[in-house]
Amino acid sequence: LQSRGLGDVYKRQQCEIEEEALRICNVSKEQIQAYPPMREVYVKFVNMLSKYVDKFDKKDKFFLVGYNNASFDNHFLKAFFVQNGDNYFYSWFWVNSIDVMVLSTQHLMRKRHEMTDFKQETVARALGIQIDSAKLHDASYDIQLTKEIYNRISSLSFMG
Protein backbone atom coordinates (compact mmCIF):
# COMPACT_ATOMS: atom_id res chain seq x y z
CA LEU A 1 0.00 0.00 0.00
CA GLN A 2 2.98 2.24 0.53
CA SER A 3 3.74 1.99 -3.16
CA ARG A 4 0.12 2.92 -3.91
CA GLY A 5 0.50 6.30 -2.19
CA LEU A 6 -0.94 5.59 1.23
CA GLY A 7 2.17 6.65 3.13
CA ASP A 8 2.00 6.73 6.90
CA VAL A 9 -1.55 6.25 8.07
CA TYR A 10 -2.38 7.01 11.65
CA LYS A 11 -5.65 6.38 13.39
CA ARG A 12 -6.84 7.02 16.88
CA GLN A 13 -7.07 3.75 18.74
CA GLN A 14 -10.27 2.70 20.46
CA CYS A 15 -8.51 0.41 22.91
CA GLU A 16 -6.00 0.52 25.74
CA ILE A 17 -2.47 1.20 24.57
CA GLU A 18 0.43 -0.31 26.49
CA GLU A 19 3.40 1.86 27.46
CA GLU A 20 5.79 -0.61 25.82
CA ALA A 21 4.00 -0.18 22.48
CA LEU A 22 4.28 3.60 22.79
CA ARG A 23 7.99 3.31 23.53
CA ILE A 24 8.69 0.98 20.58
CA CYS A 25 6.75 3.20 18.15
CA ASN A 26 8.18 6.39 19.68
CA VAL A 27 4.79 8.07 20.12
CA SER A 28 2.89 9.47 23.07
CA LYS A 29 -0.73 8.98 24.10
CA GLU A 30 -1.25 12.68 23.33
CA GLN A 31 -0.04 12.18 19.77
CA ILE A 32 -2.40 9.24 19.33
CA GLN A 33 -5.33 11.26 20.68
CA ALA A 34 -4.59 13.86 17.99
CA TYR A 35 -4.96 11.27 15.21
CA PRO A 36 -8.21 11.35 13.23
CA PRO A 37 -11.05 9.08 14.40
CA MET A 38 -10.77 5.45 13.34
CA ARG A 39 -13.92 5.56 11.19
CA GLU A 40 -12.60 8.53 9.22
CA VAL A 41 -9.35 6.69 8.49
CA TYR A 42 -11.26 3.53 7.55
CA VAL A 43 -13.38 5.41 4.99
CA LYS A 44 -10.29 7.03 3.43
CA PHE A 45 -8.48 3.70 3.40
CA VAL A 46 -11.32 1.84 1.67
CA ASN A 47 -11.72 4.68 -0.84
CA MET A 48 -8.02 4.41 -1.64
CA LEU A 49 -8.24 0.61 -1.99
CA SER A 50 -11.19 0.93 -4.35
CA LYS A 51 -9.06 2.94 -6.79
CA TYR A 52 -6.97 -0.17 -7.43
CA VAL A 53 -9.13 -3.20 -6.65
CA ASP A 54 -12.70 -4.16 -7.47
CA LYS A 55 -13.76 -5.85 -4.24
CA PHE A 56 -16.56 -7.65 -6.11
CA ASP A 57 -14.12 -9.30 -8.53
CA LYS A 58 -12.83 -12.55 -6.99
CA LYS A 59 -9.72 -12.36 -9.17
CA ASP A 60 -8.78 -8.79 -8.25
CA LYS A 61 -7.10 -8.54 -4.84
CA PHE A 62 -4.08 -7.08 -3.09
CA PHE A 63 -1.33 -9.20 -1.59
CA LEU A 64 -0.47 -8.05 1.91
CA VAL A 65 3.32 -7.87 2.03
CA GLY A 66 5.39 -7.21 5.12
CA TYR A 67 7.95 -8.43 7.61
CA ASN A 68 6.32 -10.80 10.12
CA ASN A 69 2.95 -9.65 8.82
CA ALA A 70 1.39 -13.12 8.60
CA SER A 71 1.39 -13.50 12.38
CA PHE A 72 1.05 -9.83 13.32
CA ASP A 73 -0.02 -7.04 10.96
CA ASN A 74 -2.59 -9.01 8.96
CA HIS A 75 -4.62 -9.73 12.09
CA PHE A 76 -4.58 -6.08 13.16
CA LEU A 77 -5.63 -4.88 9.74
CA LYS A 78 -8.46 -7.40 9.58
CA ALA A 79 -9.56 -6.37 13.11
CA PHE A 80 -9.55 -2.74 11.92
CA PHE A 81 -12.10 -3.69 9.25
CA VAL A 82 -14.23 -5.64 11.74
CA GLN A 83 -14.14 -2.74 14.24
CA ASN A 84 -15.61 -0.62 11.48
CA GLY A 85 -18.42 -3.08 10.80
CA ASP A 86 -16.82 -4.54 7.68
CA ASN A 87 -16.58 -8.33 7.63
CA TYR A 88 -15.37 -8.41 4.03
CA PHE A 89 -11.64 -7.88 4.52
CA TYR A 90 -10.88 -10.67 2.04
CA SER A 91 -12.84 -8.85 -0.64
CA TRP A 92 -9.79 -6.59 -0.83
CA PHE A 93 -6.92 -8.94 0.05
CA TRP A 94 -5.86 -12.45 -0.83
CA VAL A 95 -6.01 -14.72 2.20
CA ASN A 96 -2.40 -15.77 1.55
CA SER A 97 0.06 -12.98 2.17
CA ILE A 98 3.74 -12.50 1.42
CA ASP A 99 5.70 -12.58 4.67
CA VAL A 100 9.29 -11.54 3.99
CA MET A 101 10.43 -12.90 7.37
CA VAL A 102 9.25 -16.38 6.39
CA LEU A 103 10.79 -16.06 2.92
CA SER A 104 14.13 -15.05 4.50
CA THR A 105 14.31 -18.24 6.53
CA GLN A 106 15.38 -20.41 3.62
CA HIS A 107 18.20 -18.05 2.67
CA LEU A 108 19.56 -17.75 6.20
CA MET A 109 18.97 -21.25 7.57
CA ARG A 110 22.68 -22.11 7.55
CA LYS A 111 23.49 -18.87 9.43
CA ARG A 112 20.46 -18.90 11.76
CA HIS A 113 22.29 -20.53 14.69
CA GLU A 114 24.81 -17.65 14.59
CA MET A 115 22.11 -14.96 14.64
CA THR A 116 20.93 -13.46 17.94
CA ASP A 117 17.35 -13.19 16.67
CA PHE A 118 15.38 -12.97 13.44
CA LYS A 119 14.26 -9.36 13.71
CA GLN A 120 14.11 -7.28 10.57
CA GLU A 121 17.31 -5.40 11.43
CA THR A 122 19.24 -8.61 12.11
CA VAL A 123 18.04 -10.25 8.91
CA ALA A 124 18.87 -7.16 6.84
CA ARG A 125 22.40 -7.05 8.27
CA ALA A 126 22.87 -10.79 7.64
CA LEU A 127 21.94 -10.18 4.01
CA GLY A 128 24.47 -7.33 3.72
CA ILE A 129 21.95 -4.50 3.72
CA GLN A 130 23.08 -1.20 5.27
CA ILE A 131 20.90 -0.07 8.20
CA ASP A 132 20.14 3.40 9.54
CA SER A 133 19.52 2.48 13.20
CA ALA A 134 17.95 5.87 13.92
CA LYS A 135 15.13 5.10 11.49
CA LEU A 136 14.24 1.62 12.76
CA HIS A 137 10.55 1.24 13.72
CA ASP A 138 9.62 4.18 11.50
CA ALA A 139 6.83 2.80 9.30
CA SER A 140 8.21 4.17 6.03
CA TYR A 141 11.72 2.94 6.79
CA ASP A 142 10.44 -0.49 7.82
CA ILE A 143 8.64 -0.72 4.47
CA GLN A 144 11.82 0.29 2.65
CA LEU A 145 13.84 -2.33 4.58
CA THR A 146 11.25 -5.01 3.90
CA LYS A 147 11.43 -4.21 0.19
CA GLU A 148 15.24 -4.35 0.24
CA ILE A 149 15.20 -7.71 2.05
CA TYR A 150 12.63 -9.06 -0.42
CA ASN A 151 14.66 -7.87 -3.40
CA ARG A 152 17.84 -9.36 -1.94
CA ILE A 153 16.36 -12.79 -1.25
CA SER A 154 14.59 -12.77 -4.62
CA SER A 155 17.87 -12.12 -6.43
CA LEU A 156 19.54 -14.87 -4.36
CA SER A 157 16.81 -17.30 -5.43
CA PHE A 158 17.48 -16.64 -9.08
CA MET A 159 21.23 -17.01 -8.60
CA GLY A 160 20.78 -20.55 -7.29
Predicted regions: what they are:
Residues 16, 89-90, 131-133:
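Short hydrophobic "helix-edge" motifs at membrane interfaces and signal-peptide entry regions
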Residues 3, 100, 146:
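Ser/Thr-centric signal marking residues that sit
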Residues 10, 104, 121-124:
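Conserved protein kinase catalytic domain
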Residues 1-10:
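Single conserved hydrophobic/aromatic residue that forms the stacking wall/gate
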Residues 14-23, 117:
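Short, flexible, mixed-charge acidic loops at enzyme active sites
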Residues 22-107:
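Conserved DEDDh/DEDDy metal-dependent 3′-5′ exonuclease domain
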Residues 63-70, 75, 80, 111-160:
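Acidic, Mg2+-coordinating catalytic module of metal-dependent nucleases/exonucleases
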